[in-house]
Amino acid sequence: MFAPEVISREDRDGGYIETLLPAERGEVYYRSCVGGICRYSSDWFQAEIYLNQMLQP
């Protein structure tokens, strides 16, 4: 199994959202991460929601 290619990254307030391109054919998806915990989504706006939720104290 091959790792996805990170095609962009946006850092914000101690977390980030990466835009990922699958190694094999498929659609772009997003990874929201804070402190080593990540959530995945197929929608940029959902990735923003995940990041905001994980950044809240």
Feature locations, PLM:
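Short N-terminal "domain-start" leader segments
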Residues: 1-29
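A short, charged, amphipathic alpha-helix used as a generic interaction element across diverse proteins
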Residues: 29-57
